[in-house]
């Protein structure tokens, strides 16, 4: 932890900029989850349920 703070001080980065950058990084993780991960998971669950229903109905026809 001391090495990171020394690096920030040596790079002449203000604490406000470092805090803002950290906040934006975390916000981008949440945005990625909302825009990519959640819709992809919902789609995969939908396809999986649909496939399960098709296999169940195909088994009953035999």
Swiss-Prot record:
InterPro entries: PSII_PsbX (IPR009518), PSII_PsbX_type_2_subfam (IPR023428). It is found in: Cellular thylakoid membrane. GO terms for cellular component: photosystem II; plasma membrane-derived thylakoid membrane. It is a single-pass membrane protein. GO terms for biological process: photosynthesis. Pfam families: PsbX. Keywords: Membrane, Photosynthesis, Photosystem II, Thylakoid, Transmembrane, Transmembrane helix. It comes from the Bacteria. The chain crosses the membrane at residues 26-46. Involved in the binding and/or turnover of quinones at the Q(B) site of Photosystem II. PSII consists of a core antenna complex that captures photons, and an electron transfer chain that converts photonic excitation into a charge separation. PSII forms dimeric complexes. Belongs to the PsbX family. Type 2 subfamily. This is Photosystem II reaction center X protein.
């Amino acid at each position: 932890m001391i090495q990171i703070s020394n690096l920030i001080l040596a790079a002449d980065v203000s604490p406000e900029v470092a805090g803002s950058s950290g906040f934006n990084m975390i916000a981008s993780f949440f945005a990625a989850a909302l825009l990519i991960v959640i819709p992809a998971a919902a789609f995969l669950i939908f396809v999986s349920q649909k496939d399960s229903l098709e296999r169940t109905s195909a088994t009953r026809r035999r």
